[in-house]
Amino acid sequence: MIGKLKGIVDSYGEDFVILDVNGVGYVVHCSARTLQRLPKPGEATDLAIETHVREDMIRLYGFRSDAEREWFRLLQTVQGVGTRVALGVLSVLEPAQLATAIATGDKGAVARAPGVGPRLAARLVAELKDKAPAFAPVDPALVALTGAVEDRTAPQPVADAISALVNLGYPQVQASAAIAAALKGLGDGAETVEAKTLIRLGLRELAR
């Protein structure tokens, strides 16, 4: 089995790169995010590889990090998720973002992936929620905050601030993370903060 390839980028296809390794061209399928981060043809790169062997073919999947490869494997443990859908998810969410989205139950972020509808997004979140923190650090405060917003137990200024950031076009998981960071920075002052202040601080966090 091939676990890693290091070579020269030969050319690109719609969803793959041809990597020249000592004169042999390997077709390696990648997420759109990974393809965008690879160098131009003629330059060197390396990829972590997942090898799938079937009776009629051998297919290679490439990743910029071991974490991305682990998520590729984990996503496929959920019914209805094959290699194409797994790559689609990793095309819109990098590993840390995916871990946070699943840990906080942000089905909307997961559903942005091609081939993932609301029902499959809900299944992914439900089945992988307990496993997500093992793949990337997830802020417990963010998880608690997201749960409070969903349960309608979060202070109104907090809920309003998150809603405002979402209305500005930020994904739910990013909006929640920004407000969680703002609240942490306020310390004791978080108990009396107004929504407009949280929005301003949240935008500052998002701009970093």
Swiss-Prot record:
Has three domains with a flexible linker between the domains II and III and assumes an 'L' shape. Domain III is highly mobile and contacts RuvB. The gene is ruvA. This is Holliday junction branch migration complex subunit RuvA. Residues 65-143 are annotated as: Domain II. Signal peptide: none annotated. The keyword DNA repair applies. Keywords: Cytoplasm, DNA damage, DNA recombination, DNA repair, DNA-binding. Residues 144-152 are annotated as: Flexible linker. The lineage of its organism: Bacteria, Pseudomonadati, Pseudomonadota, Alphaproteobacteria, Hyphomicrobiales.
